[in-house]
Amino acid sequence: MRYCFSGHESFPCKSMWLKKGYDYLVDRNRFTDPDAVVKLGVGKNMVQSIRFWLRAFGLLNDDEATEIAHYLFDDRDGRDPYAEDNATLWILHYMLVVTAVSSIYRLFFVDLQREKKEFDKEQVLSFIKRKCNVPE
């Protein structure tokens, strides 16, 4: 696995960004379009961050909305277009962990959890150094 700790332009995933990004895609737009800033109503770095978070949650693949994205967010047939159901949040958390885009989540919630159920700061640092092949 190639580890990645960037791409979100320092923005956490904000409320409704996944829906906003999904709607933008199904309207046949691309995040690289010159008018993406205007159409999405956010800054240039936020456009890239929305794209990153869609990929991280497994909702975007090769600039196309994925099956799970349609299942959740489609205005007509989506199960929870506005992410109001706790089950949607569970699905999204699962997708974030199993999708290797934002590898920090997978590292902590899958790999580290497999080794230790409880841990302290030093154990986390040692784990990260070991995973990234950094000498202790």
Predicted regions, residues:
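Donor-sugar nucleotide-binding helix/loop cap in glycosyltransferases
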Residues: 1-136
